[in-house]
Amino acid sequence: MLTIALSKGRILEQTLPLLEKSGLIIAKEELNSRKLILDTNLTDVQVIIIRATDVPVFVQHGAADIGIAGKDVLLEHGANNLFEVLDLDITKCKLMVAAESKDKLKQNTLKIATKYVNSTKRYFQNKGQSCEIIKLYGAMELAPKVGLAHCIVDLVDTGNTLKANGLIAVERIEEISSRLVVNTASFKTKNAQIKSWIQNIEYNL
């Protein structure tokens, strides 16, 4: 049995057509149910629906053979025991530093609000910038307005939310899109099946 880990939301919506082109169909009744393990039209493939941040964890520990996750999640989680094999070129956006102005980044110790703690730390360490990272789970754009932080690090798509809150994107950390990842052990034990899936998906990109 091959287990594929997906997360609900944009990734699932944009991945389903690609999977269908590759021969994997999940019935609407399955998708609309409260089940977390979904049957497919293929007897040897099942899909599990989990939180986006948990996809690499399930793949890393072998609870799923294949997963589809955003590059932002993979950067935060690390890549032990998994291969990143394909850029699916969907759910595209950018991980950006945003502030009220570029001058706000000129600080001895920069205060940054973000939920992307590891990516932020790596980026500013590589620049040699001393920083204090404040972990938030939402309403990131509020932090500079109320003096909580000098800037934020967040995903930016159109930039409209930043603009509406008086912020501008000042530095790009990473281009983000959904990636296909594979458990390293599964790649050896289920090599033919997994390679076939990778080739099918790559062909239909």
UniProtKB/Swiss-Prot annotation:
The enzyme's E.C. designation: 2.4.2.17
Catalytic activity entry: 1-(5-phospho-beta-D-ribosyl)-ATP + diphosphate = 5-phospho-alpha-D-ribose 1-diphosphate + ATP
Keyword Lyase assigned: no
Subcellular localization: Cytoplasm
Recorded GO MF terms: ATP binding; ATP phosphoribosyltransferase activity
HAMAP family attached to this UniProt entry: HisG_Short (MF_01018)
Domain notes: Lacks the C-terminal regulatory region which is replaced by HisZ.
The protein's name in its UniProt record: ATP phosphoribosyltransferase
Gene name tied to this protein: hisG
